[in-house]
C-alpha cells in the first residue's frame, strides 16, 4: 500500500449502508522502546500511510472514522543491510495497546498537532492564471474517473442502487479551470481509491480555505448546508440527493469565483493549512503513485535498500523550526517519489529541489511533478518551482551547485553508513553561512570541541540543536525520537583560530 493510500483506507473511507461511525482496531505486536543505538536501523517498505489527526473540517471521513495525514518521506538507500519484514501501522493514537515502555508512552502522549508553517506575508498564494477566465481548455490532470475506469477497471461497483445509466459526476474547483470528472462508484476492496469520499473532502477543504465568512452558511448550515446534505444523501443511499448537492455546490463556487470573493479570500491568506496541503498531495499521489506502487515493491524486493519516511506533520514542523519561507531554497537529498519536495513547494511556496538515484522512484516522482503543476492550478494555488534530479546527490553537478545557495537541506540519514555521512560533511564546506541542515543523526559527535588537532574538520563549521519529534512522525515506529538542526556558522572556528594567533 502506498504512502497516501492510508488516507483512502482508514481516514476517508465510507460504506453507504453504515449510518453511524465505525470503530476499527488493528492489533499489532510492538517492539520494546528502542535505545538510542537501536534507532540506527529503521527499515521501511514502499511508501506507506500517514497517521496524523487533522482538523475535522478538512479530514473527517463521511463515516466519522479518523483521517490520516498524507505525505511521506523516503529514506535514502543504504547498501548491504538486511530488511526485516515491514509492518503496516493502521492504528491511531487511541488504539494504544499499552505494551510500550514508560518512555515510549511518554513520547506517544506528547504528540503534537500544531498548525502548518507560519504566515509568509511575502508570498502570493493565488495563481493569477488560474483565475484569469482563460482556462477554457482542460488541464492535463488525471481525472478521478480514470482511476476507476481505466487504471483499475473491475475493482469498483455502483455506489447507489438503481443508478442512472451514466455514473459520471463533475466537480468544480475554486479556480476558473474546467471541472474534474468522477464516477459514482465505490471500491470492492476498502484499500482502493474512494471517489465519493474524495468529493466530500474536496468540498470540506474548499469550504474551509476559499469561502468568505459571510457566505459560509450555505455550506455549513447544520440543516440545509451543502456539506450536511451530502452526508445525508450518502447515509440514505440517495443518488438523486447526492447529485443535487454537488450541483448546488458547483453553482455556488462558480458564483463566488465570478464575483471575485474567492480570489479576495485567497489574496488575504498567507499560509496554507496542513489539511489543505494534505488534501492536494493525497489527490496527486492517489492518481499517480498508488496505481503503480507495485513497481516500488518490485524494486525494493530485489535490493538491500532500507526505506523510512518522515510524515507530513513532522515535515511541516521542520519547515517551522527552520523558518523556511517562499524566498528560500529547499533541498531534499534522497527524495524518493518526491513527496517532501512537493510539500515544500506547496506549503511554503519556495524553490524546492530533490535528488534520487532509484529509477522506479524517479519515474513516479516525475508523474507526481506533472500532476502537481496541473492540480495546483486546479486549486488556484501558485506553488514554488520544483526540480527533481536523477542520480547520486554526491555527484550530480546541479545538486552540488544548488547546495551552495540552499537555505534548508533535509537529509534523512537514519540508516546512512558512516562513510556516506562523512562524504556528505565535505559538501558542507561549500554551503553558505546560515544554511540549516536537518537530519535524524547528528553530523557532529556529542561533546565535540574545536581543538588544534581537528582544526580543519568541516564539522567545526556547524552549530547543532537537538529537537524532539513526537509519535506518528516517522513511518517505522509510533514512538518519538530526536532530530538535529545544524546551522553553518563559522564564527566559533574563526574565534578559536584568532585565539591561537
Curated annotation (Swiss-Prot):
<comment type="function">
    <text>Histone methyltransferase that specifically trimethylates histone H3 to form H3K79me3. This methylation is required for telomere silencing and for the pachytene checkpoint during the meiotic cell cycle by allowing the recruitment of RAD9 to double strand breaks. Nucleosomes are preferred as substrate compared to free histone.</text>
</comment>
<dbReference type="GO" id="GO:0000781">
    <property type="term" value="C:chromosome, telomeric region"/>
</dbReference>
<keyword id="KW-0804">Transcription</keyword>
<dbReference type="InterPro" id="IPR030445">
    <property type="entry name" value="H3-K79_meTrfase"/>
</dbReference>
<dbReference type="GO" id="GO:0031151">
    <property type="term" value="F:histone H3K79 methyltransferase activity"/>
</dbReference>
<feature type="region of interest" description="Disordered">
    <location>
        <begin position="1"/>
        <end position="121"/>
    </location>
</feature>
<feature type="compositionally biased region" description="Basic residues">
    <location>
        <begin position="71"/>
        <end position="83"/>
    </location>
</feature>
<dbReference type="GO" id="GO:0006281">
    <property type="term" value="P:DNA repair"/>
</dbReference>
<dbReference type="InterPro" id="IPR025789">
    <property type="entry name" value="DOT1_dom"/>
</dbReference>
<dbReference type="InterPro" id="IPR029063">
    <property type="entry name" value="SAM-dependent_MTases_sf"/>
</dbReference>
<feature type="binding site">
    <location>
        <begin position="330"/>
        <end position="339"/>
    </location>
    <ligand>
        <name>S-adenosyl-L-methionine</name>
    </ligand>
</feature>
<dbReference type="GO" id="GO:0000786">
    <property type="term" value="C:nucleosome"/>
</dbReference>
<dbReference type="GO" id="GO:0031509">
    <property type="term" value="P:subtelomeric heterochromatin formation"/>
</dbReference>
<keyword id="KW-0949">S-adenosyl-L-methionine</keyword>
<dbReference type="GO" id="GO:0140956">
    <property type="term" value="F:histone H3K79 trimethyltransferase activity"/>
</dbReference>
<keyword id="KW-0808">Transferase</keyword>
<feature type="compositionally biased region" description="Basic and acidic residues">
    <location>
        <begin position="105"/>
        <end position="121"/>
    </location>
</feature>
<feature type="domain" description="DOT1">
    <location>
        <begin position="180"/>
        <end position="501"/>
    </location>
</feature>
<comment type="similarity">
    <text>Belongs to the class I-like SAM-binding methyltransferase superfamily. DOT1 family.</text>
</comment>
<dbReference type="GO" id="GO:0000077">
    <property type="term" value="P:DNA damage checkpoint signaling"/>
</dbReference>
<keyword id="KW-0156">Chromatin regulator</keyword>
<protein>
    <recommendedName>
        <fullName>Histone-lysine N-methyltransferase, H3 lysine-79 specific</fullName>
        <ecNumber>2.1.1.360</ecNumber>
    </recommendedName>
</protein>
<keyword id="KW-0539">Nucleus</keyword>
<dbReference type="GO" id="GO:0032259">
    <property type="term" value="P:methylation"/>
</dbReference>
<feature type="binding site">
    <location>
        <begin position="392"/>
        <end position="393"/>
    </location>
    <ligand>
        <name>S-adenosyl-L-methionine</name>
    </ligand>
</feature>
<keyword id="KW-0805">Transcription regulation</keyword>
<dbReference type="GO" id="GO:0042393">
    <property type="term" value="F:histone binding"/>
</dbReference>
<keyword id="KW-0677">Repeat</keyword>
<dbReference type="GO" id="GO:0005634">
    <property type="term" value="C:nucleus"/>
</dbReference>
<dbReference type="Pfam" id="PF08123">
    <property type="entry name" value="DOT1"/>
</dbReference>
<feature type="binding site">
    <location>
        <position position="356"/>
    </location>
    <ligand>
        <name>S-adenosyl-L-methionine</name>
    </ligand>
</feature>
<feature type="binding site">
    <location>
        <begin position="307"/>
        <end position="310"/>
    </location>
    <ligand>
        <name>S-adenosyl-L-methionine</name>
    </ligand>
</feature>
<dbReference type="InterPro" id="IPR021162">
    <property type="entry name" value="Dot1"/>
</dbReference>
<keyword id="KW-0489">Methyltransferase</keyword>
Amino acid at each position: 500500500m502506498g504512502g497516501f493510500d492510508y488516507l483512502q483506507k482508514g481516514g476517508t473511507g465510507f460504506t453507504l449502508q453504515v449510518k453511524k461511525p465505525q470503530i476499527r482496531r488493528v492489533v499489532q505486536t510492538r517492539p520494546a522502546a528502542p535505545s538510542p543505538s537501536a534507532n540506527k536501523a529503521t527499515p521501511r517498505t514502499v511508501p506507506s500511510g500517514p497517521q496524523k489527526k487533522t482538523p475535522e473540517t478538512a479530514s473527517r471521513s463521511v463515516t466519522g472514522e479518523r483521517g490520516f495525514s498524507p505525505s511521506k518521506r523516503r529514506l535514502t538507500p543504504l547498501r548491504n543491510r538486511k530488511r526485516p519484514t515491514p509492518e503496516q501501522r493502521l492504528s491511531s493514537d487511541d488504539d494504544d495497546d499499552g505494551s510500550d515502555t514508560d518512555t515510549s508512552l511518554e513520547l506517544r502522549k506528547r504528540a503534537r498537532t500544531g498548525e502548518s508553517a507560519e504566515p509568509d506575508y511575502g508570498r502570493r498564494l493565488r495563481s493569477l492564471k488560474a483565475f484569469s477566465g482563460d482556462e477554457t481548455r482542460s488541464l492535463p490532470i488525471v481525472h478521478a474517473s480514470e482511476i476507476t475506469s481505466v487504471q483499475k477497471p473491475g475493482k469498483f461497483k455502483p455506489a447507489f442502487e438503481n443508478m442512472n445509466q451514466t455514473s459520471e459526476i463533475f466537480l468544480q474547483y475554486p479556480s476558473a479551470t474546467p471541472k474534474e470528472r468522477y464516477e459514482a462508484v465505490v471500491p470492492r476492496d476498502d484499500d482502493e481509491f474512494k471517489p465519493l469520499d474524495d468529493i466530500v473532502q474536496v468540498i470540506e477543504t474548499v469550504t474551509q480555505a476559499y469561502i468568505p465568512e459571510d457566505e459560509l452558511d450555505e455550506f455549513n448550515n447544520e440543516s440545509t448546508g451543502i456539506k450536511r446534505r451530502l452526508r445525508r444523501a450518502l447515509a440514505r443511499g440517495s443518488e438523486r440527493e447526492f447529485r443535487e448537492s454537488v450541483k448546488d455546490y458547483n453553482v455556488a463556487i462558480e458564483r463566488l469565483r465570478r464575483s471575485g470573493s474567492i480570489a479576495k479570500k485567497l489574496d488575504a491568506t498567507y499560509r496554507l493549512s496542513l489539511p489543505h496541503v494534505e488534501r492536494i498531495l493525497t489527490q496527486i499521489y492517489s492518481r499517480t503513485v498508488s496505481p503503480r506502487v507495485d513497481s516500488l515493491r518490485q524494486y525494493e524486493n530485489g535490493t538491500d535498500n532500507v526505506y523510512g519516511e518522515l510524515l507530513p506533520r513532522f515535515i511541516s514542523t521542520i519547515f517551522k523550526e527552520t523558518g523556511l519561507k517562499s524566498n528560500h531554497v529547499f533541498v531534499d537529498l534522497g527524495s524518493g517519489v518526491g513527496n517532501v519536495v512537493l510539500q515544500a513547494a506547496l506549503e511554503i511556496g519556495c524553490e524546492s529541489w530533490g535528488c534520487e538515484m532509484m529509477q522506479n522512484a524517479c519515474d513516479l516522482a516525475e508523474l507526481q511533478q506533472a500532476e502537481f503543476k496541473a492540480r495546483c492550478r486546479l486549486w488556484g494555488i501558485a506553488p514554488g518551482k520544483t526540480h527533481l534530479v536523477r542520480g547520486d546527490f554526491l555527484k550530480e553537478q546541479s545538486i552540488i551547485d544548488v547546495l551552495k545557495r540552499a537555505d534548508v537541506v533535509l537529509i534523512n540519514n537514519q540508516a546512512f553508513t558512516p562513510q556516506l555521512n562523512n562524504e556528505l560533511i565535505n559538501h558542507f564546506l561549500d554551503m553558505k553561512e546560515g544554511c540549516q541542515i536537518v537530519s535524524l543523526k547528528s553530523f557532529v559527535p556529542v561533546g565535540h570541541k574545536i581543538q588544534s588537532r581537528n582544526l580543519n574538520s568541516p564539522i567545526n563549521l556547524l552549530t547543532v540543536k537537538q529537537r524532539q519529534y513526537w509519535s506518528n512522525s516517522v513511518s517505522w515506529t509510533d514512538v518519538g525520537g530526536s532530530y538535529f538542526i545544524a546551522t553553518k556558522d563559522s564564527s566559533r572556528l574563526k574565534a578559536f583560530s584568532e585565539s591561537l594567533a
